Every structure is written in structure tokens, then in C-alpha cells.
Amino acid sequence: MDAQIKNEIVELTKAMLETFTKEYIKAYTIQITKKAIKDAKAIPSPYLLEPRPRDHDKSDVFSGYLVKLGAIRKNWLKRHFVVRYDYSIDYFVDDKHTNKKGTINLCGYSVNDDPNKSGLDRILKIAEKMGVDTSSIPKPAQLPPFTIELYHYSRRCYYIQCANEEEFKEWIEIFKTCCRRSHGFKNKDPCHIAAFGIAVRNTRWSLGRWGWFGYGGNENQILSDIILDEIEYDILGRALSKLPNAPWFIRNYLRNKMMTVIEGMVSSAVAPAWTGLSKTVEELRPTIEPRIKNQVDPIAQAQTNIINKMRESMMSQIKPAMEEHVNKHLKKIIGEIRTPIENGFDESLKIWNEKTNAYNGNGSTESFSSYRSYPNSYWTMYPAKDKISPLYSIVEEYRPIFRDYSSYFICYDIKESINNMAYDGAYTLEKTVTQDQVDVASAKNQTHSKYQHDVILGTNMQLKFVVREMVKPTLCKIINPLTKPLLNTLSSSIPSAIGDFIDINELYNQLVDDILNDSTQVVIDELN
């Protein structure tokens, strides 16, 4: 790696960490403010089902024998895998669990059901960046049928072999769920988690990277990932093109050595930066929380006033863009995406009915042990989730019009919402019986009515979610340059006493969401 490329990487890393630091401190302050306002206003949830506490059921989610490829000897070994309630995965020599061999945390990973293809695709992609003739590249060794790849580009990858197709399909979904639900953050404070995500988004936006970006892991890993992603986008191609002309295996070896150096440079900068930033916000919170609590009403009123001023001053820029690029497509989009979403939520209610009618316990907490975990089962929830599957191709058809969204993420998020509603439905019935002391028959009727209400609400919410995910990145590329001068003017008008607790960009983001939600609701009402 020459000195110029190395210096570019150092400067980019430094600039991104500086941007993230500023964005995170601001976002963390805003999240504490939001929490204080929410606590003071005691705004009720629109959903009627009780949200299931994360640790309500600590029983294992799933288990079974699989064959795992060893990291060092590269031999296939039979192991007993256990998915814990927090979606970490332990694996043992056998099902007696006396000899634990390791733990896998899949936060930030992806699941590939055809590792032979995905592995070759990655090699070809790298070869193209290095200017290598792809016809000269030897194909990698073929993995056995029913092999699953648990992939991360900068962490250890896992290769898991299943016994048959049915087992393969089941574990694919289990591993995908673990990727989505396992927690990588070391700091579990909700304000921190929300602020971190906003800071990641805003850091990427500051570089003009408007599209969807999936991430996961602990704080250091995520910060390293977003920097490495930008290095790959902006610098890596030029660095790889400067490698000496040589056979593929030599160039690939040099490329891997280069990536090891780059990853080391980034991680060595990220670790102390995050340690210092984390300490700063820990010291900040006890100082600002009392100030926020004393000014909840003025802050909330100022936020409302600013959003109203934004709407008044910016609609002349936003409305034409909505008419030209969004509104003319909404009726068709909603008409097409509505059926699979409705069907998915409706099917989840049918499953709840079946499982609830099958419950014949005595109403004790212990009698619900099997019932409360029914949403864990892939095959039990499959009929509801499968109803969402047609949505993927529908959403993909709009890529020529809207870009920078993930059809996979959209579909998977809705499937997760359906599954979470099933958890809440099971928990609500159990709580109504065991804590509220309502008889089982009456509790079933009460919970059924709540579930019906939430199915309608959940469908509506997910329609709006899909529209936002598809449309917003493209819309923001158009309207942000037009609205930026007005944002700057409004920002300068915020009273200094509460300026630290108001993020003009987040309020603008809320305004855009509100506009898209309102437009979507108009079409939903027309179609009803």
C-alpha cells in the first residue's frame, strides 16, 4: 500500500470518527429528551396487546444436531446446537451439554443458503476490482449439499451442514432470526441504542450515502464496519488496482494482507475513540437530565412550533417533488403490497386461535410453559410468514423508479412484526389469566378482540413502513438540497436555552415521515 492511499485511509477514518462523535452526542441528548417528554406525557401505545418483556420466557428457542466445519483443522464435526432465549447459539459435543465447544453471536451476520454460489460471487467481485481476468480464477472447493453459510466480511464465518432439506429450511430461518434478534451492543440503554443508530445514519448521510445499510455487532465493530464500508466504496478500488500484475492466488494473497492492514488501522483508531466518547456521554447524562426535566413543556412546545414552521415554509418545495415522484405511484404500490401484508397478519391470528383453543391448562404460570413459546417454532409460524413472501418480488419491481432500499429487509421486518405480535398475543393471554385473575374463557375472548384490533393496526403500520422504506431515500435526494437553506434558518432561531435538546435534522426527518404517512393513509382510505 503506497503512502498516498494510506494517508487517505487515515484521514477518512479520522473525519468519520469526528462526524460520528458530533452526531452521537447530539442524538444521545435528543433521545434523553424524547424519553423525558414521553415519560411526562405518558403517551399510551396504540396497540392493545401487552408487549412481552424480552426476558419473560428464558427457555431455549431451538436445538438440534448439525455438522460444523472446524475453523482450524477444516474437518466436519457433529455438534449439538442450542439457540438460547437471547438468540446466542451454544454448541456442544452432544446433547448432554457437558462439553461446550463455543458460542456464536450472529448480530451483524447474513445467512447464505447457497455458499458455493455466494463464495464464488465474492471471489469474482474481488477479481473485478483488482482487474484480474476472471476466467483464470480456479473455482473454490465445493461444499456438501444442505450447507449453510453464516457470513460476515470481517469476522469469522461458519459453515453448517444439515441432514436433509426440511432441516436445512428450518435452520435457515432460525439462523436468520438469530441475525436479527441477537444483541451486539455492550451498552443496553435504549437511549444509547437509538442514538447510535441515528449517528450511524447521519454519518453516512454526511458522505452522500443515502441508501439502506445493514449493520450489527458491538459498538467498536459497527463503527469499524461503517468506516471500512466507506473505504471500500471510495478508496479500495484504487488501492487494489495498484497491486502488481501476478497470478490470481498471489494477488489475492496480497489483497488479503492489505485488508488485514486496513482493518488494523481502522480498529486501532476506533477503539480509543469509542472508549472516550462512551465515557463522555456517561458523564453528560447526570448533568443534562435535570435540565431536560425542568424544561419538558418548553422543549415539547418548541418542537411542535418548529415542525409547523417547517411544514409552512417547506411544502412549496416538498409538494411538487411528492406529486412528481411519489404520489402518482402510491395507489399502485399500496394496492399491490396490501394483500400479502393483510394475509400475513390474518394468518397469525388464525394460528393464535388454534394454539389458544388447544390450551387446556389450569391457569397456573407453569401450565403456560409450552403455550407461551409457540411463536418460537418455525413450522408453526411458517404459514403466516409465508404469506409475506410474494411481497419481495412486488417491491423489487419498483427499483427502476426508487432505489437504495432493501427488499429483503422490508420483508423480513414485516415477518418479525408478525412474529412479535404472536409473542404479545400469547403473553397477553397468560398475563390476563395469571396476573389479572380472569378466567381462561373470558381471557381468551378479551385477548382475541385485542389481537383483532392489532392485526388491523399492524397492517396499516406496515403499509406505511413499506412506503417509507421504498420512497424516502429517493425523495430525500431530491428535496434535501432544496430545504437545506430553510433548515439552517430555522436552526438559528431555536432559543439558546433549549438548543442542545432540539435536533433540527431529526425534526425534519419526522416531518418527511409524517408527510409520507399522511399521503399513504389518504390512499389507504380511498381503497377501503
Curated annotation (Swiss-Prot):
The residues covered by the PH domain are 59-180
Under the heading Gene3D superfamilies, the entry gives:
Pleckstrin-homology domain (PH domain)/Phosphotyrosine-binding domain (PTB)
Against Pfam families, the record matches this protein to: PH
Concerning SUPFAM superfamilies, the annotation shows: PH domain-like (SSF50729)
Protein name, per record: PH domain-containing protein DDB_G0267786
Q: Which organism is it from?
A: Dictyostelium discoideum
Lineage, uppermost ranks: Eukaryota, Amoebozoa, Evosea, Eumycetozoa, Dictyostelia
